[in-house]
Amino acid sequence: DTASDAAAAAALTAABAAAAAKLTABBAAAAAAATAA
């Protein structure tokens, strides 16, 4: 059970990291578009 809890926590952490990376990429793209405009 502890192992499955740890695996679930790791999956959530990875999902959070992926979401944060996507937000950062989206922000960078928006900033680039604003600069180009």
Swiss-Prot record:
Q: Which UniProt keywords are given for this protein, alphabetically ordered? A: Antifreeze protein, Repeat
Q: In which domain of life is the source organism classified?
A: Eukaryota
Gene Ontology molecular-function annotations: antifreeze activity
Q: Which InterPro entries match?
A: Antifreeze_1 (IPR000104)
**UniProt family annotation:** Belongs to the type-I AFP family.
Q: What does this protein do?
A: Contributes to protect fish blood from freezing at subzero sea water temperatures. Lowers the blood freezing point. Binds to nascent ice crystals and prevents further growth.
Its protein name is: Ice-structuring protein 3
